């Protein structure tokens, strides 16, 4: 029943975009910000398919979601707790109150950018009387980068052949410019990444169990995302398909995208920025070198490590919030 209802809504959303273009994206973005479950992201990614410009679609979606969020704010302010509880449940009211007390306007930014239910945050912003200007600015800061990133991803998918050529060019640019010093150092940096991540995580856990648990959660989530993507994308290693690769390590036939070493290195480094700024900067520098080493030794493409960086930074940021407490059963 729920699944069928969702598919009906999706079909209606697709009809709106297919027939009304940017107006359809605006309507979807506006309504998703306070009530309906279909996000505009999928239509921004597929904008080219509908004959639309991805960047313009992202901007239209940002305007729509900002105005829709303000409408949700108004509903929360005027209708209050009883209607909110009927629509979303009492659980979200209590968790939302805890979230707002801890993060304030930053909670709006987090919900706008992340998979957290933004519509719930919009209602709660009105219920808890957040300043309208702060709410609006927080929405734009959270939503605009997200939609632009989605638009860029959609543009990349639409130009996959050109992207592949750039990826190979950058791989050779790094891998073919080698010297005996880097040939000695880079394999060591690459091979010791996992042991260093494990040892550092253990030390952090012993010194600060609460943060250590968050770090382990972030690393586990990053690993699962990277592992799943590897076998979903199933991109072969560069040394299996390209000629004249300067190969210093061998990862067998394991898929290439994304780089697991880079993913976990950036998860650790980003997490440590919230634990100790100096330590975080030190490990961030190390993570960048790890990413470079994976291309240098011939086992990854530049896009593999770029994807690993993005996943790692995202998962590392989760140590900043008690996300596993706040989005139970979402």
Swiss-Prot record:
It comes from the Archaea. GO terms for molecular function: sphingosine-1-phosphate phosphatase activity. InterPro entries: DedA_domain, P_Acid_Pase_2/haloperoxi_sf, P_Acid_Pase_2/haloperoxidase, VTT_dom. SMART domains: acidPPc. Pfam families: PAP2 (PF01569), VTT_dom (PF09335). SUPFAM superfamilies: Acid phosphatase/Vanadium-dependent haloperoxidase. This is Uncharacterized protein MJ0374. It comes from Methanocaldococcus jannaschii (strain ATCC 43067 / DSM 2661 / JAL-1 / JCM 10045 / NBRC 100440).
């Amino acid at each position: 029943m729920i699944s069928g209802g969702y598919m009906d809504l999706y079909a209606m959303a697709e009809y709106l975009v297919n027939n009304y273009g940017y107006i359809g994206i605006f309507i979807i973005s506006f309504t998703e910000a306070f009530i309906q479950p279909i996000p505009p992201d999928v239509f921004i990614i597929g904008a080219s398919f509908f004959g639309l410009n991805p960047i313009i679609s992202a901007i239209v979606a940002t305007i729509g979601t900002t105005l829709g969020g303000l409408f949700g704010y108004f509903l929360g302010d005027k209708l209050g707790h009883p209607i909110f509880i009927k629509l979303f449940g009492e659980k979200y009211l209590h968790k939302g109150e805890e979230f707002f007390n801890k993060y304030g306007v930053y909670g709006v930014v987090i919900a706008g950018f992340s998979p957290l239910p933004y519509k719930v945050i919009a209602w709660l912003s009105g219920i808890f009387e957040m300043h309208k200007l702060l709410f609006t600015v927080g929405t734009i800061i959270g939503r605009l980068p997200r939609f632009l990133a989605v638009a860029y991803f959609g543009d990349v998918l639409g130009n996959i052949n050109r992207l592949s050529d750039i990826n190979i060019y950058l791989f050779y640019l790094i891998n073919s410019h080698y010297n005996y010093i880097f040939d000695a150092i880079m394999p060591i940096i690459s091979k010791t990444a996992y042991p260093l991540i494990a040892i550092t995580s253990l030390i952090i856990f012993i010194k600060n169990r609460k943060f250590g648990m968050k770090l382990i959660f972030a690393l586990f989530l990053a690993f699962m995302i990277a592992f799943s993507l590897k076998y979903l994308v199933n991109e072969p290693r560069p040394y299996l398909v390209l000629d004249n690769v300067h190969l210093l390590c061998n990862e067998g036939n394991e898929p290439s995208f994304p780089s697991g070493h880079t993913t976990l290195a950036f998860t650790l480094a980003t997490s440590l920025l919230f634990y100790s700024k100096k330590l975080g900067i030190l490990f961030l520098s190390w993570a960048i070198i790890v990413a470079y080493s994976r291309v240098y030794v011939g086992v990854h493409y530049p896009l593999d490590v770029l994807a690993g960086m993005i996943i790692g930074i995202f998962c590392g940021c989760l140590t900043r919030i008690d996300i596993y407490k706040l989005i139970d059963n979402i």
